[in-house]
Amino acid sequence: MEPRLSFVTLGVSDLQRATKFYEEVLGLPRISTPPEVTFFELGKTWLALYPRELLAADAGVPAAGSGFPGFTLAHNVRSAAEVDALLKEVAAKGGRIVKSGTRADWGGHTGYFADPDGFLWEVAWNPQFPHT
């Protein structure tokens, strides 16, 4: 397998609400898509929003979850100040901050917000990480 991530697909409870969050709160550019799915191009990786029940059916698993989905998504920025600024912007637009920006044990600066379906996004600055 080539080391490449093509899509991150989030099973959402309300496609219209989730699409609005990612477009208006995070400012992601939406790609023209069919009505049952929304795509956002994030460089070489695409973010897909798909109804949770349909995604579960496609994967052959039950749609009911236990709460924490078992993963987080991360967005790295170029400075600690950018972490705090982005979290402030998300909060100002109605996003829910889960953890304010704070110094991390590994030497960077990190915080978390949740989208309307509870998916956790880490916003991080890592001085050791060249791919920001």
Predicted regions and their residues:
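Vicinal oxygen chelate
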Residues: 1, 87-132
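N-terminal beta-strand motif that seeds the catalytic metal site of vicinal oxygen chelate
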Residues: 1-17, 70-75, 127-132
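Core segments of cupin and vicinal oxygen chelate
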Residues: 9-56
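Short connector loops at helix/strand junctions that flank enzyme active sites
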Residues: 42-44, 66-70
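Mid-chain, well-packed structural core segment of small domains
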Residues: 72-88, 94-96
